[in-house]
Amino acid sequence: MKIVFLGLSITSSWGNGHATNYRALVRELSGRGHDVLFCERDVPWYAENRDLPRPPWGRTALYDSVEQLRAEHAEDVAAADLVVVGSFVPEGVAIAEWALETATGTTAFYDIDTPVTLAKLRGGDREYLAPDLVPRFDLYLSFTGGPTLEVLEEEFGAHRVVAFYCLVDPDAYRPVAAEKRWDLGYLGTYSDDRQPALKRLLIETARRAPQLSFVVAGPQYPPEIEWPDNVERIEHVAPGDHPAFYASQRFSLNVTRPEMRAAGWSPSVRLFESAACEVPVISDRWEGLEQIFTVDEEILIADCAQDVFDFLGETGEEESACIAGRARERVLAEHTAERRCEQLEREVEAVPAR
């Protein structure tokens, strides 16, 4: 197939969890023989932090404006068998309208932020999607599964809504040998709504356990945050360094944004990445998680700092290795780029011809 992605960013992972997802997907699709073009808005904050300026798979095109995108890539969109518009694309409504009008093949909205999208649609926020556009896509690929799929169909008229969870590239995310530097680590960009959970599960645990070491990696954390002395801060970890970063932790913490926790069935890309690196994961609790991983066998669930403290103190090396190994096996079986590409191919094939 000829496939065009109109996505947030594939060239920069700075503050952008979409990047590793897109990279793995484009790499796998290209490897399966598809002709893939990724169009990305050239914005200063990504331009200054490009860790993959020229992706080696498919083609990548940068554009400065919607007008430039239309002028230079109308033929690509019109000729594509599949056009995928992603969430959080700058001027996404205008781009989606143009893509839907121009495309002659299958169209899909790839929502890597489904609960946030629903909140925006209900609140009249047209940052990257509008309610009237939802039914016009042939496919709605949702980061979130569970009851949210019915909401998209019944409340917004979406067609062929499918749970299209985040994915991991097993060649990029794999176990590596590294000295254990931290007892618990977290990788993620700062978010106002996610910070209370990070404070509850990591910062408070660090205060209770000054003899242990912790790390929080990611950009945009405000300077006024009071970090305990045993919490190390790292501004950015490039994707190529993620496996070594994870391997340097005894446990990795997964924290979910409130909208996604409320919706449930919203596994993050970091969750799959750390599991693929065979590091045991401690996660906050949300509905549907038990369908992604078997609790206590493939993942540990914490509601408060005491839970985390107990896991760190009571889970032996052999037990944690077994948990990590089982989680990696589950990810490799169900959540790789190969599995998602197979799913995408099936879904596109099932869309009725225009």
Predicted regions and their residues:
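Extended catalytic core of nucleotide-activated donor transferases of GT-like folds
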Residues: 4-9, 15, 22-27, 32, ...
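Catalytic binding pocket for nucleotide-activated donors in carbohydrate/polymer assembly enzymes
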Residues: 7-15, 21-24, 30-31, 37-45, ...
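Short, solvent-exposed loop/turn segments at secondary-structure junctions
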Residues: 9-12, 42-46, 88-91, 113-116, ...
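Conserved catalytic-core segment of nucleotide-activated headgroup transferases in glycan assembly
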Residues: 21, 167-251, 261
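Anion (oxyanion) recognition and catalysis
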Residues: 30, 100-101, 108, 206, ...
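Proline-centered loop/turn at the N-terminus of a beta-strand
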Residues: 105-106, 139, 160, 213, ...
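Helix-loop-beta element that forms the nucleotide-linked donor phosphate-binding surface
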Residues: 149-167, 176-177
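Hydrophobic residues at beta-strand termini and immediately following loops
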Residues: 164, 187, 302
